Swiss-Prot record:
Name of the protein this chain belongs to: DNA repair protein RecO
UniProt family annotation: Belongs to the RecO family.
Highest taxon of the lineage: Bacteria
Organism: Bacteroides fragilis (strain ATCC 25285 / DSM 2151 / CCUG 4856 / JCM 11019 / LMG 10263 / NCTC 9343 / Onslow / VPI 2553 / EN-2)
Pfam families: RecO_C, RecO_N
Length: 242
């Protein structure tokens, strides 16, 4: 059955000489895999250049039962980027977040609130004119809400440790495991959780602190998501912002 929807590009894999497999998070059905024919002429209805990291694609696909790979018939840009492909910092963030989402989101079901969050965030990054150095950090902390991983902030007191394994702040250093962060870093993490895209530029954070926050967030997700790997694009992002 042919259906139209909008998707966010997470990953592209060469399938053979004539086709690619594109992983997208879609408004209609959540995470899904699509077969895209590599165009051989300028008149092709689906162009490979569309499928850039985090690109928003409006497309029509043949959703057939009893298969996990759907063929895309037509595709076009839903909201063409104005800055992400041309800004090396934004491009690096997009590459990192696309890989992160590809590894973190496995849900093959409609989740419109999550899709709306992703779409809003991507468009905000593309159009923002203010500082966005903390964007990926705020994005990942807010993403944890949709994945059921958001830490409990209610019991925080100054001087608390953050127990990453149990996702709670605690006044007592955890004794049964080493997956926790010290009080000074826990306070910085709490500050990060309270930021949003409009206010994050008001919070001062140097490169070392930013890199440490990213390492903590990445480790937090690895603790809570089975088989979450070390991301290849993480080093690229670190080098660019160093």
């Amino acid at each position: 059955m042919l259906q139209k929807t909008v998707g966010i590009v997470l990953h592209v894999l060469k399938y053979n000489d004539t086709s690619n497999i594109v992983e997208m998070y879609t408004e209609l059905s959540g995470r899904a895999s699509f077969l895209v024919t590599v165009p051989r002429s300028k008149k092709a209805t689906v162009k490979s250049v569309l499928f850039q990291p985090l690109a928003l694609i409006e497309f029509e696909a043949d959703y057939r039962p009893n298969t996990s790979l759907f063929r895309i018939k037509e595709a076009k840009s839903f909201s063409p980027f104005t800055s992400i492909p041309y800004d090396p910092f934004k491009s690096a963030i997009a590459l990192f977040l696309a890989e992160f989402l590809y590894r973190a989101i496995r849900e093959e079901a409609e989740n419109r609130p999550l899709f709306a969050y992703l779409q809003h965030s991507i468009l905000w990054l593309d159009t923002c004119k203010i500082s966005f150095a903390n964007f990926h950090l705020v994005f990942l902390m807010r993403l944890s809400r949709f994945l059921g991983l958001y830490p409990n902030l209610d019991d925080y007191h100054a001087g608390d440790y953050f127990d990453m394994l149990n996702a709670t702040f605690t006044s007592v250093r955890p004794q049964l495991h080493s997956s926790y962060i010290q009080p000074d870093e826990a306070g910085r993490l709490l500050q990060l959780m309270r930021m949003n895209y409009e206010t994050m530029h008001l919070f001062g954070m140097n490169r070392t602190e930013r890199a440490r926050c990213l390492a903590i967030i990445n480790e937090y997700y690895r603790l809570h998501l089975p088989d979450f790997p070390i991301l290849k694009s993480l080093d690229v992002l670190k080098e660019l912002f160093d």
